[in-house]
Amino acid sequence: VVNTYFLDTSALVKRYVPETGSNWIQSITDVAANNDLTISQITWVELHSALSRRQREGTMSAGELDIILQKFRNEFETKYRIIEVDQALIESAGQLVVQYRLRAYDAVQLASGLYVKTLLMSVPETRLIFVSADNRLLDIAQSEGIAFDNPNNYP
């Protein structure tokens, strides 16, 4: 069975910045683990925002920010399968906002995960795991029939 991990930004940031769950994220994203790694195109913006906030707050230097963003840039299209944010995905996210009262970017992340779920339905021996550090988003993913995991459960 091949695991396909869909990582939202709250999970993926742990690959680039040490925090609770970083070791687990490193293990599932390691090349040797042979997992498929999928992210939403919107993660590009969200990760830049999260890391820039750390620099503004003084927990990361400008030099560290540059190094981490360069690593992410290098991995963005080589390490991850990118789910494009197109009109159909935006419409799906809009429906999720209304249905679950989600924030806009959370809805785009969930819509991206649901899109991956539909793609994998026809692929035998694959398992989708939606990974987020947001418990509410994970509860909603579960209600949509997606297996999930939270990196914060692996301190």
Can you describe what each PLM-predicted range is?
Residues R53-A88:
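Helix-adjacent hinge/juxtasegments
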Residues V2-T4, V116-P155:
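Acidic, PIN/NYN-like endoribonuclease modules and their adjacent C-terminal/linker elements
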Residues I39-V45, Y105-V108:
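Aromatic- and histidine-enriched alpha-helix N-cap/loop-to-helix transition segments
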